[in-house]
Each structure stands twice: as C-alpha cells, then as structure tokens.
C-alpha cells in the first residue's frame, strides 16, 4: 500500500489521497511534463513507499494486540519508547498496519511534544533525552542554570554525545524542584552530581510509597461498592437515588472555573440514553500545580473508589483514566493497582482503561482530552453539544 509523504501532507492537510491516484500494484505513476509527456523516475519517492522491513518491525513491536484507531497515541508511545524517536519509515509502517492515511498518523504524532519525528534525510536525535524543567518553580531553584551547565558539559565532551539535555515545561514535581526526567524516570532535586549518577548507572526513580489495595480495603475501603454490587435491582435503585440526593445536598462544584454543580452534572449524564462513559482528567499542566500527582501517588484507591461509585450512580460502562506522560511512576502504580482491583471482582461489569498523554498542555481542557483519548490531536471541541450529551465516541460522558 502506498502512503502519502510530507509533500502530500502539506498539500492535502487532513484529506486522504484518492485510491485511483496510484495503480493497484502500488507503483507511483510517472510525473507529467509541461508538454504532457511522461517523465521517468528521478529516484525513490520520499516518504510514499512502505518499507517492508520497517512495517515488519512495527508489527513485531505491537505484537498480536488488536489494532484500534483510538489507541494510535499509545502505539506512537511504544515506538518512541523503543527507538527514542519516530522515523518516517516507522510511521508509514504503522499507518499501513492500521490502514490509515500517512497524513493522519503524521498530524497526530506532530501535535504532541513528547514525540520526536525524524523525516527522510534527517539525523535521529541522541538515544537518550533528559528533560530539565525550566518552569517557574524549577527556574527559581536553578533549573535554567542546571540546563546550561549540563549542555556545556556535553559540549566539552564530559558527557557522552548519545545523551542530550532539553528544556521542559512544568513536570508537576514542584515539591522537589529543580526536577528532571530521564526518559520515564523522574529525578527530584536535580543537580550535576545526581544527573551524572543517573547517566552512569541508569538508576530509575522508584515508585513512591502509597496506600495499596490491601491496606485500603482494611480501612473499610470499597465497602459501599460491595453493598451496591450485592444489592437487588430495587435496592440498588433506592441506594443510587439516596446517594444522588446526598451529592446534590453537598453542593459540590467543579473546579474548572465555571463552578457547575456536581450533583446536577451527574444527573444530566445519567439522564441520557447509554452507553455512558467517563473520563478522569489526570493531565494537570498548569505551572506550579501537582495536586493530582500528590494524591495519585499516595492514595490512588480513593480516586478509584470514586470512579466505581460514579459508575453505579450514573450507569457508566467504561472509564478512561488520562494521566500525564510526565507521571510515569503514577502510570506504573495505577497499572499495578488496577490489576488488583480487577482481580478482586469489585469492578463488576465496569471496564477501566489507562491512557497516557504525550506532553500537550491543551489536553488538560476536557474536550481536548476527549479528542486525545480517541487517538486524535488534542484540539478543543466547539460546544454545544456538550460532553454530557455527546462526549467520548459521541456517547454521554461524565
């Protein structure tokens, strides 16, 4: 299958090239001269042909998992994690495997800062990237000076050329400023000594101590969920009605700025025909903000129990947890705890899927997050319709 290259992307934007442009055998047609004469080939077409070896490499990397359009960003993460960049050949191979236009894959990959795209003829970046936060909190603690120092040491040959240092926006680790990230490992209180030690030894940042599933259950965690799971249909409806009244009486409001009543929002979503979905926004990107990182890294089951409670009250069938790519330790611990929660049987029929962002600040906005979960660029949606009516995959979304 022939894929569009960079020239096609600039020329067509989001449009796919008609299938009739190329013959069925995948051979590009000769170019037409000014007099209508056919021109011979000038060489291999740039970025258009799928390289079988690259396609096979991506197929092996992805394994036997069923390919889903909404998982495109995760597949891009897998390639970035494996090779340290996204080459045009690998993107073409991925597009071919997913039966998507190359333009569509490229525009998604190029939208997110954590993907390093390498076009034909471009030199691949160093194999290892260390991002040093230069946002406000870290800047005040010497982040910019540290970045300059590490870059100077690399220029002087004191650090291997396979390592590069780049500035980064807020990593959500303001409590340990200045912070740095060596791939998926956070380095708190970063300085030349501990960064050199990380470069030399590759010592990862350990998962923090937190209240795990067993300890949370021992403190009466999920007791209400157990009662809801065990209730008859009539008893369940009565319990949900009482819980919804309690939520409304509590006068809780959203913290996104509009202050919309939480109880009313949940009731609105519950009023639409299903299936109903939920998206948990863990993509805080405001400089100086790390509240989500704090509670998720210390007491994750408090959030997860809230998800299960909402699933009963609103009738949610599937929930997506969208977590910042800058929080790898949280992604690791949530993966572990979700497996324990599923094994316990408390989830019932609810599905929970963990998604990671890719460094796009705008995805903290709810509709941009929805677009990203669907595997697209994180562009905010026009409203109405509101997400409560038509959100994720056009379903009512809490």
Predicted regions and their residues:
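Feature of Fe-S/electron-transfer and energy-metabolism proteins
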Residues: 2-398
């Amino acid at each position: 299958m022939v894929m569009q290259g960079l020239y096609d992307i600039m020329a067509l934007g989001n449009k796919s090239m008609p299938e009739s442009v190329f013959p069925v055998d995948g051979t590009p047609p000769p170019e037409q001269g000014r007099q209508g004469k056919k021109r011979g080939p000038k060489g291999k077409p740039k970025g258009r042909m799928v390289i079988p070896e690259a396609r096979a490499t991506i197929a092996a990397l992805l394994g036997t998992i069923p390919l889903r359009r909404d998982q495109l960003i995760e597949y891009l993460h897998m390639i970035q994690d494996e090779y340290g960049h996204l080459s045009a050949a690998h993107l073409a191979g991925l597009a071919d495997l997913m039966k998507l236009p190359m333009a569509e894959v490229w525009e998604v990959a190029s939208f997110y800062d954590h993907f390093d795209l390498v076009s034909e003829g471009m030199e691949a970046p160093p194999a290892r990237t260390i991002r040093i936060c230069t946002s406000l909190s870290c800047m005040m603690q010497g982040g910019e000076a540290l970045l300059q120092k590490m870059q100077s040491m690399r220029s002087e040959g004191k650090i291997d050329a396979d390592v590069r240092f780049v500035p980064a926006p807020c990593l959500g680790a303001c409590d340990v400023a200045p912070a740095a990230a060596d791939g998926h490992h956070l380095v708190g209180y970063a300085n030349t000594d501990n960064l050199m030690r990380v470069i030399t030894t590759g010592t990862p940042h350990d998962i923090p101590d937190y209240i795990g599933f067993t300890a949370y259950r021992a403190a009466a965690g999920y007791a209400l969920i157990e009662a809801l799971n065990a209730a008859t249909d009539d008893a369940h409806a009565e319990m949900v009605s009482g819980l919804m009244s309690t939520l409304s009486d509590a006068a809780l409001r959203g913290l996104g700025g509009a202050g919309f009543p939480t109880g009313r929002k949940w009731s609105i979503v519950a009023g639409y025909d299903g299936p109903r979905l939920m998206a948990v926004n863990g993509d805080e990107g405001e400089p100086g903000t790390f509240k989500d990182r704090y509670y998720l890294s210390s007491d994750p089951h408090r959030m997860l129990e809230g998800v299960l409670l909402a699933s009963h009250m609103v009738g949610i069938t599937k929930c997506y947890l969208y977590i910042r790519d800058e929080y790898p330790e949280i992604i690791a611990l949530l993966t572990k705890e979700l497996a324990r929660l599923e094994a316990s049987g408390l989830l019932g029929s609810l599905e929970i899927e963990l998604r990671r962002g890719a460094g796009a600040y705008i995805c903290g906005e709810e509709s941009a997050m929805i677009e990203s979960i669907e595997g697209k660029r994180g562009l905010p949606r026009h409203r109405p319709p509101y997400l409560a009516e038509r959100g994720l995959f056009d379903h009512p979304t809490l």
